[in-house]
Amino acid sequence: MKAAEARALARTLAEELGANPRVQLVYVFGSAADPDAAEVRDLDLAIGGAPSFSREELLAMAARLGSTTGITLDLVPLERAPVVLAHEIANHGTCLLARPPEAETSFVLRARDAYWDFKPLLEQQWRLAGARQEARLRGPQA
């Protein structure tokens, strides 16, 4: 699907999701939110609810909406998104629905705050992963 079509579809799906009064936030992220993308294979939407949606509820919503659109739809619960993914959504995703409007600001601030707290650990993980990769490339030491 063309990226522009996917973005338009995401807006339509956000409106449909917004018919549920529990839905407070809907973001499109991934390739469909990338202004440089020409094609997308799936549509990534992050959804925030009060109370948050169960895995079963999200799977049912994704199946229902995906069956009517013909594209694979991934729904990610914002409340349970890993720190790095939440940061990616906050920084590079597009908010399609925020109810109330300050819900978007609240999510972005929480996601960035959690990421900055986690960033030193993430950098250490990358250093350790790099050291392990270098050791594998060198092979066994005699």
Model-derived features: where do they sit?
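Catalytic core of pol beta-like nucleotidyltransferases
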Residues: M1-L25, A33-E39, G48-A142
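Short, well-ordered beta-strand segments
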Residues: D44-A46
